[in-house]
Curated annotation (Swiss-Prot):
The N-terminal proline-rich region interacts with the SH3 domain of PLCG1. When phosphorylated, interacts with PLCG1, PLCG2, GRB2, VAV and LAT. Interacts with LBR and AGO2. Interacts with FGR. Part of a complex consisting of CLNK, SKAP1 and FYB1. Interacts (via SH2 domain) with FYB1; this interaction allows SKAP1 and FYB1 to promote tyrosine phosphorylation of CLNK by LYN. Interacts (via SH2 domain) with MAP4K1. Residues 309-419 form the SH2 domain. The keyword Phosphoprotein applies. The record marks 335 as: Interaction with FYB1. Keywords: Cytoplasm, Phosphoprotein, SH2 domain. Coiled coil: none annotated. This is Cytokine-dependent hematopoietic cell linker. The keyword Phosphoprotein applies. GO terms for biological process: cell surface receptor protein tyrosine kinase signaling pathway; intracellular signal transduction; mast cell degranulation; negative regulation of natural killer cell activation; positive regulation of natural killer cell cytokine production. Residues 159-164 are annotated as: Mediates interaction with PLCG1.
Length: 428
């Protein structure tokens, strides 16, 4: 009874030891309680022969069971450890994940029919192979081979992208539908010359000039030619450059007349807009270089003699007596200089405020021009003596007393009328 009890306890102890996965030592210690002290005491006791044999049997059974058992989880771990996952290749900035494979597929010269046939036939082949794989029984070896084979296929094989639809332009870039034939203009209207296309701007310029001129000139004083030409302005083809240049020159001439002091009133016939004149009339033969009116060059003595304000060779005393008798401010005349030199050929005599001012007219050989005075009045140059007289009829002349060397005391006067010769001066 005691032996059976010992066997039972020994077997249960051996099962516990097997579960804890270690073998019994050769010498083991059993705890015993001391009755006197009530504490555990460990005593070493050698194992019996049958206990040694039992432990050896248990160890052999354990090793045999480990060899026969096939664990699929361990196999999976071994296969996954053998697979190496490499990092993804860098993509260029100009390439994207969805366009990389599409570019490779587009480079291959395949017709559209072959692409569609491949893309359509591929899903049917995949479904058939999947059905065959499901029907066959899968063994352990095949399973491991499939795992390794699928991994290699995933690593080496590049999947083809799905077929893309045809590229279509956005709605805003799509071409417009063709125009109906009724709305198309005829060919004669479509192909026009640039001169005809500039006609609206010419008409608007003429209308503007007519409106501005209508505010200044009454309607009853206009020429009938202007209204007649305005009616036929659609048939005339006048270049825009000519009309604009004539418009600017006419405005420039009007400003010059206003700047001269308004001595000559502007008549309605002279103040017509450029639209009422032909292009040949608007083109002037000369060009304005300054604010002075243009005159032909008359620098010779013979050209000066025909003017009424030129008296020739007279003494200074006789001229001053004649001015005192006339006694009109602004009266003037031109006489020959007493020195009779080429540099100072003439003298301009002006009466103002009961005093006669004698101003020399100098001739500049370098420029072939005339200048007035010694330079204190300014550095103005003229092409002829007539230019000097016409200029100071419109602008005041600066009169400086000969006794005043500093030129501080100055007076201004316009040339109004020449001194009558028959009244006060006797012919020489």
């Amino acid at each position: 009874m005691n032996r059976q009890g010992n066997r039972k306890t020994t077997k249960e102890g051996s099962n516990d030891l097997k579960f804890q996965n270690f073998s019994l030592p050769k010498n083991r210690s059993w705890p015993r309680i001391n009755s006197a002290t009530g504490q555990y005491q460990r005593m070493n006791k050698p194992l019996l022969d049958w206990e040694r044999n039992f432990a050896a049997v248990l160890d052999g059974a354990k090793g045999h069971s480990d060899d026969d058992y096939d664990d699929p989880e361990l196999r999976m771990e071994e296969t996954w450890q053998s697979i190496k996952i490499l990092p993804a290749r860098p993509i260029k900035e100009s390439e994207y994940a969805d366009t990389h494979y599409f570019k490779v597929a587009m480079d291959t010269p395949l017709p559209l029919d072959t692409r569609t046939s491949i893309s359509i036939g591929q899903p049917t082949w995949n479904t058939q192979t999947r059905l065959e794989r499901v029907d066959k029984p899968i063994s352990k070896d095949v399973r491991s081979q499939n795992i390794k084979g699928d991994a290699s296929v995933r690593k080496n094989k590049i999947p083809l992208p799905p077929p893309r639809p045809l590229i279509t332009l956005p709605k805003k870039y799509q071409p417009l539908p063709p125009e109906p034939e009724s709305s198309r203009p005829p060919l004669s209207q479509r192909h026009t010359f640039p001169e005809v296309q500039r006609m609206p701007s010419q008409i608007s310029l003429r209308d503007l000039s007519e409106v501005l001129e209508a505010e200044k000139v009454p309607h009853n004083q206009r020429k009938p030619e202007s209204t007649h030409l305005l009616e036929n302005q659609n048939t005339q083809e006048i270049p825009l450059a000519i009309s604009s240049s004539s418009f600017t020159t006419s405005n420039h001439s009007v400003q010059n007349r206003d700047h001269r002091g308004g001595m000559q009133p502007c008549s309605p016939q002279r103040c017509q807009p450029p639209a009422s004149c032909s292009p040949h009339e608007n083109i002037l033969p000369y060009k304005y270089t300054s604010w002075r009116p243009p005159f032909p060059k008359r620098s010779d003595r013979k050209d000066v003699q025909h003017n009424e304000w030129y008296i020739g060779e007279y003494s200074r005393q006789a001229v001053e007596e004649a001015f005192m008798k006339e006694n009109k401010d602004g009266s003037f005349l031109v006489r020959d200089c007493s020195t009779k030199s080429k540099e100072e050929p003439y003298v301009l005599a002006v009466f103002y405020e009961n005093k006669v001012y004698n101003v020399k007219i100098r001739f500049l050989e370098r420029n072939q021009q005339f200048a007035l005075g010694t330079g204190l009045r300014g550095d103005e140059k003229f092409d002829s003596v007539e230019d000097i007289i016409e200029h100071y009829k419109n602008f005041p002349i600066i009169l400086i007393d000969g006794k005043d060397k500093t030129g501080v005391h100055r007076k201004q006067c316009h040339l109004t009328q020449p001194l009558p010769l028959t009244r006060h001066l006797l012919p020489l």
